[in-house]
């Protein structure tokens, strides 16, 4: 840990790590030590025992987002896997019946609003 602390201390900006997928065991410790924010995606939970992350369970020091630079947009994700979308619609959005396709604007707005208003999440 020679260069990273200097980079983090060189700015007043909040630093966020893309700690998704397979990350080395030392990463959480380093992030905690340097107060680096974690990146949280509801559709890609870090807990392998769940299909979707619960926004209310995101760490205090985190940024939650709908997707990242190498993932599909919300509308693309919605139509990618109808069965997964249906499960999200029922279990995460608590809605009954078939999930609408394509994703209507009112529902996209609801999903984004849930991310923006979730605590302690800071959505960007």
Predicted regions span which residues?
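Catalytic cores of glycan-processing enzymes that make or break glycosidic bonds
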Residues: 1-124
């Amino acid at each position: 840990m020679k260069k990273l602390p200097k980079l983090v201390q060189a700015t007043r900006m909040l630093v966020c790590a893309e700690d998704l997928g397979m990350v080395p065991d030392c990463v959480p410790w380093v992030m905690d030590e340097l107060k680096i924010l974690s990146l949280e995606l509801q559709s890609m939970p870090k807990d392998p025992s769940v299909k979707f992350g619960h926004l209310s369970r995101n760490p205090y020091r985190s940024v939650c987002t709908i997707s990242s630079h190498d993932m599909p947009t919300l509308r693309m994700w919605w139509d990618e896997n109808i069965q997964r979308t249906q499960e999200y619609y029922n279990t995460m959005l608590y809605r009954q019946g078939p999930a609408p396709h394509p994703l209507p604007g009112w529902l996209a707005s609801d999903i984004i609003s849930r991310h923006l208003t979730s605590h302690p999440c800071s959505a960007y």
